[in-house]
Amino acid sequence: GQISMDSVGVEDTAEQLNRLIDIGETMARKYDVVVTNPPYAGMGNLSAKVNEFAKENYPTSKSDLSTIFMERTLSMCKNDCYMSMINIPVWMFLTTYEKLRKSILLNDTYVNMLHLGRGIFGSDFGTTAFVIQKGHIQNYKGSYRRLFDKQGAVDSVETKEQWFFSEKGLYVAKQDELAKIPGAPLAYWASKNFIAAFEGDNLGRLCDLSEGIHSRNNDEFLRLWYEACANRSSLSTFSKAKKWYPCNKGGGYRKWYGNNDYVIDWENDGQHIRNFKKASVGNNRHRFDEGITFTTITSAERTFRYSPEGYLYDMAGPTFFVHNKELMYYILAAFSSKLGYHFLSAINPGVSLKLGEVNNFPIIVENQELGQVDFLSKENVTMCKDDWDAFETSWDFKVHPLVSMSKGLWDATSTAAAMDYFYGYLPEASCPLEICYLLWQGQCKERFEKLKANEEELNRIFIDIYGLQDELTPEVEDKDVTVRKADLQRDIKSLLSYAVGCMFGRYSLDVEGLAYAGGEWDSSKYQSYIPDADNVIPITDEEYLNDDIVSRLCAWLKVVYGADTLEANLDYIAKALGNKGSTSREIIRNYFLNDFFKDHCQTYSVTGSGKRPIYWLFDSGKQNGFKALVYLHRYTPDTIGNLRIDYLHKMQRVYESEINRMQDMMDHSGNAREVAAASKRKDKLAKQLKECREYDEKISHLALSRIELDLDDGVKVNYRKLQTAQDGKFYEVLADSKNIMVKEKK
């Protein structure tokens, strides 16, 4: 029959409705088994509508689509039936998913789990596959497989398959016991004694743990300590009348003491940062108190360090403050022992550790062991501080160890006794510098072995206290010992860096620590070795000048180790460096020309900071026409002008003279090989001269601008400022500008 206008589309609509009804019935139906590979997406990547839906309907699992699917698929199971899934493992430990874990532990049953770690899908986020039974079975023991050795390690599928069939990482865990661990992490490997430890005191009852400052603009408020003017910094001696204060900010793997890299602007009780709307300054109660600090975000093993009085701390380096000071070193030792990693890897093995999770750490105080633990812990802090302070990146650095060792060389008897103590015999040495290195090497080895022995003894004590003899052993691997062994090339390079510091007056052979890092210059500090007068040290590819960096190094070595052993010391340095060259001076010259500034930038940086050099390299380009170092803290508006007139123009005259000499040799020599060599060198010199003239044109704009720098602005800002003329144009005259200076504001 005919179709009226009223019935048009009714059949299509009915078909769509029937489809929706089918879907609804399917979703409402209960199943014996539900299996899925869920979508992985955090709520931050999804729309506001999806977020709102998740909060309303899945408040327990709302943080990720994959965990929402866990909750939803369980609801689709009949009682006593099964849900199985492959998922990423973040839900097993993070506090964000604590409610979901508790819900499953209390209401359902983990039948089995394959905790695969990373590698199943390449360099992934990790994988876990599991079966959960709907409904709780009391005292049920689930079967778990842990198919990775180290958190974060990426292993091949073949390796995991081999481990699986060899029954590696097989655990049987009673689910009701797992629920007793605070935060309900799925720590299926936890033993009875491990779980029992949580029944006593925890860190939260013995300490105040504070998150600290959240500046929300690190470039504005934070500096690496050596960027700032020393007179405006409260470093070794606490003072409330300064601008820059030490700030714990986490850092890499280091136990007991160290990672003291940053200072924060806290002038006038933090007025600047308090006035920044986005910032929060945390709790006032323990500001500047001594405590224990750690790194919140790290993929490596988490480490804990003593924090002296006078420090602030931010979110990346929270600090806890022990109520009873007599327990501080005991608690530090517990966290720094194998116990620390063992418990924290159960509480949260992820890269980010929350403060509440640290508060759950169980602390068992054994009074009979308190004195011994306290003694060993303090000794470890002292040794690690000595190690940290032996390098110039510590603000408590006094003198380079290879220089301090030289002061005792006059006493041959005591030197021989020290050698016999460290080595059991008197090793041969080619020069005074080698003797100093051997003494330093012995000292480092002794410290390393003593710290390792102390840590193993602390491990033994805490393993016994917590009853974990079946799970942990006290032995410590060399790679996990914080203090550094001697390293010839590293230590010779650091000696050259210290020598350059003496050339600029940052250090003095007559006073310990920083001799000058801003403020008023005091010439009385420099008697044995006089620093460069105008703060410019040229680096040349040949011996053109009598005041270049190699000449100055030779003068410095004579003062430190004696003039009669200069050549032997130069040979020792050159051999350690391993650079190209036919003579010791040439090898050292090539190091300064090609590698010193790279090493300096690497030394004066920490993870995430970018390069923050304090000795700046004026560099004309690839031809090495002109290179000179300038010390940031001695810079004045006249520095560039002096550098241009007294050094750059001087090098141009040198090149012109040498070009004429090569031409004269070509014109008058009858030796073909000599003529060819002169021609080749003339071409090189011509390129260097051309580069210098082009560089002179750029640097003249900056010299005329007489640029002022403010140390408070930091290296990144000042590196750009120094290369920006009065007319606002940028002239690149410093090395590696792209990777050092702050990005241009658009």
Over which residues does each language-model region extend?
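Short coil/turn segments at secondary-structure boundaries
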Residues: 8-13, 205-220, 236-237, 259-263, ...
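Terminal accessory regions of large proteins
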Residues: 393-395, 401, 406-435, 442-467, ...
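Short Ser/Thr-interspersed hydrophobic loop/turn segments at strand-loop and sheet-helix junctions
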Residues: 248, 285-303, 313, 331-345, ...
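Conserved S-adenosyl-L-methionine
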Residues: 1-2, 14-16, 36, 85-102, ...
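Class I S-adenosyl-L-methionine-dependent methyltransferase module
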Residues: 1-29, 33
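Polyanion-binding catalytic cores of nucleic-acid enzymes and NTP/SAM-utilizing transferases
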Residues: 111, 168-323, 374-378, 393, ...
